[in-house]
Regions:
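Flexible glycine-/small-residue-rich
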Residues: 34, 91, 113
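Amphipathic helical "hinge" segments at domain boundaries
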Residues: 11-78, 82-86, 164-168
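Bacterial carbohydrate/catabolite-sensing allosteric modules
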Residues: 10, 47-59, 74, 80, ...
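Redox-cofactor binding/interface segments in oxidoreductases and associated redox assembly factors
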Residues: 32, 89, 211
Length: 296
């Protein structure tokens, strides 16, 4: 029995609980597992998926792993044994066990949100390297010389992608890429406010700050107001995401827009193509776009 269990684990075998009853039936349920329903862009991507999949007769079963590896494994173990037509995940880190299960599953698997170098199967999202490069390049072209980068509590692979784009732009213009803080804190308003003084203490020459989320950037803007630092005259601040808050903070925030709804709808179309015809390319990059406002 131990040998059988070891072989089952090694092969990533998952018994189909509905196989006897549904062997001849085709499922129209697609499972979507997300770390947190409040994750940036999650609701917009879900809406994009629904827009395409629902008219085609597919229903999306949404589950939340709460950023817990064991919870994601438990959810997917149940879902993969329940005759689902496809699985959708956000572009986040997954355990070796989950990756093995999904690679061995005879269903389409879509990771969406950001382009990965090692997708499980299908992958649609923005290119974080290109997006960060474009955001940094824009500041350089506008004459800023002493630019900093604020990151906070990102998945390591996303941090590396942002850092790659940042280094690429800065080194292309022979500028120092070393003004970087990667805070082990949530990417929220209070972190942005608390980290700005750290930048000014370490690099008083700072004239522009790139933040990897709009919430971080708006927190930095609030701290600038408290310290009577004029934005953008004394310090330019830019964000990432084009969230609602970027439009209402003062001054309105220049940011990199991520087309979450389009990512969702493109993922839906790709899944339909795979489900109906059995073919689709592994990856597709969706362009992000600069939203120029008054903070730089």
């Amino acid at each position: 029995r131990e040998k059988i269990e070891a072989a089952v684990h090694e092969l990533g075998y998952m018994p189909n609980l509905a196989a006897s009853a549904l062997a001849s039936a085709s499922s129209h349920t697609i499972a979507m597992v997300v770390p947190n329903l409040a994750e940036a862009g999650c609701s917009e991507m879900f809406a994009g998926l629904q827009q395409i999949l629902q008219p085609a007769g597919y229903q999306i079963m949404l589950a939340e792993s709460q950023h817990r590896v064991e919870q994601e494994e438990k959810l997917l173990e149940t879902l993969l044994a329940s005759n689902i037509a496809a699985a959708i995940l956000l572009s986040v880190e997954h355990s070796t066990t989950v990756r093995q299960w999904l690679k061995n599953a005879s269903i389409p698997v879509m990771e969406m949100g950001a382009i990965r170098s090692d997708p499980i199967d299908m992958n649609i999202g923005i290119d974080n390297v290109a997006a960060m490069y474009e955001l940094t390049e824009m500041l350089i072209q506008r004459g800023y010389q002493n630019i900093g980068l604020l990151c906070a509590n990102q998945e390591q692979w996303i941090f590396q992608q942002h850092l790659h784009g940042w280094y690429k732009a800065m080194l292309r213009h022979h500028m120092s890429p070393n003004r970087v803080i990667n805070a082990a804190l949530p990417p929220n308003f209070s972190t942005g406010a608390s980290q700005l003084p750290e930048f000014l203490l370490a690099w008083p020459e700072l004239d522009a700050l790139v933040c990897v989320s709009d919430e971080l950037a708006c927190g930095a803007l609030y701290e600038c107001q408290r310290r009577r630092i004029k934005v953008p005259d004394d310090l330019a601040v830019v964000g990432f995401g084009d969230s609602d808050v970027s439009r209402v903070c003062q001054p309105p925030l220049t940011t990199m827009a991520v087309p979450h709804r389009k990512i969702g709808s493109e993922a839906g179309r790709a899944l339909l193509e795979r489900l109906n015809q059995g073919n689709w390319s592994d990856r597709k990059s969706i362009a992000s776009s600069l939203c120029m406002r008054e903070s730089c």
